[in-house]
UniProtKB/Swiss-Prot annotation:
The keyword Transmembrane applies. Residues 210-226 have a biased composition (Polar residues). Keywords: Apoptosis, Cell membrane, Membrane, Transmembrane, Transmembrane helix. Gene3D superfamilies: 1.10.1410.40. The chain crosses the membrane at residues 268-284. Residues 168-258 are annotated as: Disordered. This is Transmembrane protein 102. Residues 1-267 are extracellular. The gene is TMEM102.
Length: 512
């Protein structure tokens, strides 16, 4: 009897196997299905969307206004603080990679156990034109020095900042100046720029001359925070922060520029915290307004925690960092990206109190270059699936770096920019590739931790440092990489808890 056939095979043979699924559907390292990872990443994005929408909720707006009111009170107390200034508000705290401060002690705060959402606020206390002699950039590092002459426009700047002066610029270095500044010198008391924000564009730039509407100050500010249920404000001491000290009178104006004293970032950070603490101690709670429950200084910035009235009650973290705003663009800095030109007629950058991320720290008077404004513009051009992948990788990394000096969160953010330079935009924009992109970012971060350096995205030839904790973090990252699906499920549950608000441990009990 003739045998029937199934295709080219006898009828008794098993059917041919189904076409193999692409190898990219399975993660080789962990065996996880990329489709499942992508679904978890998308779910994580939905759960975290309460603080990521185009129209922030009233709790976030109230907290923002509360912080702006605090700053206006600082100006009333100390005229050195500019009455009008641009405030750049970034979503995510410094511990989540919003800024590069290098490996620095950032405190024990962890999103979830200690707060629901974090933000970074850049507060310019000084503004200058980068073409002047005051700014000195080191060609061999990411640092700069701000040298103060005796007078600027008839104002004794050096006398005004006497308690924040540092030694002259160290010798033996090659210096460059920013270029392409289209503006004249700007007085730090009269700088008013266009609004920029990562939360709500039209309202992020506020005049600090406005009367605060949700902060009350008693006529006799004798009340201490402890007396009204707030923990005392604390100041961490570490090797990266120096206390304000008596400074000898500066050189005469006729002396060479090399002898000019510098504006010390650590001293400025100490002054900023002391001013905020003095204002905070004079406050008393206002019904229906956010409540300041904690403030402390870490490295070069101040961290405050605000409890919103709710419902739901949320605890919001704000990292307030005093910065110098510089008009112009540094020579040798990247001028183009995958998204187009970076340097334009209105280009500017910031100087921030660095955490000592270089192998050889240039001294306590060195400010670190920061391109937060350009990073904000780049973020708007990154495909949404890649942003979701980065947010997921960031959530997985969060518990691993809590309480450490690791610079991994900002390294992960920089890898995001390099990925856009390297990979096709069509690939990054496909939603089904979010899982693969998340794993790719984690794998790249592992290689960076092993090498301990990563090329700086904006400054050619410069390196970002991973810090001393890179080895231990690399081991923890390898364990996480073995089961990314489980870690993502835990991150989703954490995001659900944060969405509900409240139930946060260790806040308001003086434990920070």
């Amino acid at each position: 009897m003739a045998s029937a056939v199934w295709g080219n095979a006898p009828w008794w043979s098993p059917p041919p196997p189904a076409p193999a699924r692409p190898l990219t559907d399975i993660d080789f390292c962990s065996g996880a299905q990329l489709q499942e990872l992508t679904q978890l990443i998308q779910e994580l994005g939905v759960q975290e969307s309460w603080n990521d929408g185009p129209k922030p909720g009233p709790d976030l707006l109230q907290a923002k206004d509360f912080v702006f009111s605090l700053l206006s009170l600082i100006h009333r107390r100390d005229p050195r603080f500019p009455p009008q200034t641009e405030l750049l508000l970034l979503r995510g705290g410094i511990r989540e990679g919003s800024l590069d401060l290098g490996p620095a002690p950032l405190g024990p705060y962890t999103r979830g156990p200690h707060y629901d959402a974090g933000f970074t606020l850049l507060v310019p206390v000084f503004s200058l034109d980068g073409t002047g002699q005051e700014l000195q950039l080191d060609m061999r590092s990411c640092y700069a020095w701000l040298c103060l002459p005796e007078q600027v426009r008839g104002t004794s700047v050096r006398e005004a900042w006497q308690d924040c002066l540092g030694p002259p610029v160290p010798g033996g270095r090659d210096w460059i100046h920013p270029t392409d500044s289209r503006e004249g010198p700007r007085d730090p008391q009269s700088s008013v720029d266009q609004p920029h924000s990562d939360i709500i564009e039209p309202e992020a730039h506020e005049s600090l001359e406005k009367s605060p509407s949700n902060v009350s100050v008693p006529e006799s500010p004798q009340q201490n925070l402890t007396d009204i249920g707030f923990p005392s404000l604390s100041e961490e001491t570490n090797d990266d922060v120096t206390k304000a000290a008596d400074v000898s009178p500066g050189p005469q104006p006729s002396e060479a520029r090399e002898a000019w004293p510098t504006l010390c970032p650590a001293q400025v950070a100490a002054w900023f915290f002391a001013s905020l603490a003095a204002v905070a101690e004079s406050l008393f709670p206002v019904p229906g307004a956010p409540r300041l429950v904690h403030a402390a200084r870490h490295a070069g910035f101040t961290t405050i925690l605000l409890a919103t009235p709710g419902p739901p009650r949320r605890l919001l973290l704000f990292d307030l960092i005093p910065v110098v705003s510089v008009a112009g663009w540094p020579q040798g800095a990247r001028s183009h990206s995958w998204a187009g030109p970076l340097a334009s007629e209105s280009s500017s950058f910031y100087l921030v109190p660095g955490g000592g991320g270089q192998t050889e720290r240039p001294g306590a008077s060195g400010w670190q270059l920061c391109f937060a404004r350009q990073e904000l513009a780049l973020k708007a051009r990154i495909p949404t699936p890649l942003l979701q992948a980065h947010a997921a990788a960031q959530a997985l990394l969060r518990p691993l770096v809590a309480g450490t000096r690791a610079a991994a969160p900002y390294l992960l953010r920089t890898l995001l920019y390099w990925a856009c330079e390297r990979l096709p935009a069509l690939y990054l924009a496909r939603p089904e590739n979010a899982g693969a992109c998340c794993l790719g970012l984690l794998d790249e971060l592992g290689r960076v931790l092993e090498a301990r350096t990563l090329p700086h995205y904006f400054l050619s030839g410069q390196k970002l440092r991973a810090g001393d904790g890179a080895s231990s973090l690399l081991g923890a990252l390898a364990l996480l990489r073995g089961d990314p699906a489980r870690a993502l499920r835990a991150a989703v549950e954490e995001a659900k808890a944060a969405r509900k608000g409240g139930g946060l441990a260790g806040v308001g009990a003086g434990s920070h």
